[in-house]
């Protein structure tokens, strides 16, 4: 309780008024028996307190209640006792839907395919098999049965060959020489046989040991013409092979039966 005074005409006479602060105030004032003005004012102001004052009193009371609880916790910590912590939250139950799912199967390894011409990355492709050997240039021209001819490139006589021209001309030259040499060897063998035809196995063995046929191909610039003539003659011969004038069939290395 706080006490205020106001001066009057007489310096020794004071009129006091009081204001209610809260219970257990720091101002401990005791009214005297001769202070009738103070008693009247106190009786007049003993009604209910305003709402704002009640809210402030409740707030102070709640703050005062929190402070002793905090002080008690500090005392327990200083004494070495532990304050019980709040109970931990219960463990989360696993979902039955997750446990019922089957395990995921492992992914299949990627299948490597051979790289094509249009693909840019062919380093990781697996080789399917060994590459097929290519036929030499000119082999198709010989197998076709058409007349043999050297390559027409280049146009000028002194220009160097480039690319597959060298391999093509080599194949044509070897085929032409083989055709001419085979025809000469056939004619020489027929001449040796007809000069002294063997009549027994003994004479045949003697002729085989003494026969020496040498073939010389020197056609020059007419090599391709001679080879093409041989090809034309072979096309006109009968298709029957191994037939003789006597009608007996003989295989290579096999002698005719008597």
Swiss-Prot record:
Keywords: Host cytoplasm, Host Golgi apparatus, Host nucleus, Phosphoprotein, Virion, Virion tegument. Its main location: virion. One of its GO terms (molecular function) is histone binding. It is found in: Virion tegument; Host cytoplasm; Host nucleus; Host Golgi apparatus. GO terms for biological process: symbiont-mediated perturbation of host chromatin organization. One of its GO terms (cellular component) is host cell nucleus. The keyword Membrane does not apply. Residues 66-143, 234-258 are annotated as: Disordered. Highly phosphorylated in the host cell. Packaging is selective for underphosphorylated forms. It comes from the Viruses. Pfam families: Herpes_UL49_2. InterPro entries: Herpes_UL49. Residues 249-258 have a biased composition (Basic and acidic residues). Interacts with gE (via C-terminus); this interaction is necessary for the recruitment of VP22 to the Golgi and its packaging into virions. Interacts with gM (via C-terminus). Interacts with VP16; this interaction allows the formation of a tripartite complex composed of VP16, VP22 and UL41/VHS. Interacts with the capsid-binding protein UL16. Interacts with host CGAS. Belongs to the alphaherpesvirinae VP22 tegument protein family. Tegument protein that plays different roles during the time course of infection. Participates in both the accumulation of viral mRNAs and viral protein translation at late time of infection. Modulates the RNase activity of the virion host shutoff protein UL41 probably to ensure necessary levels of key cellular mRNAs and proteins. Plays a role in microtubule reorganization that occurs after viral infection by stabilizing microtubule network. This is Tegument protein VP22.
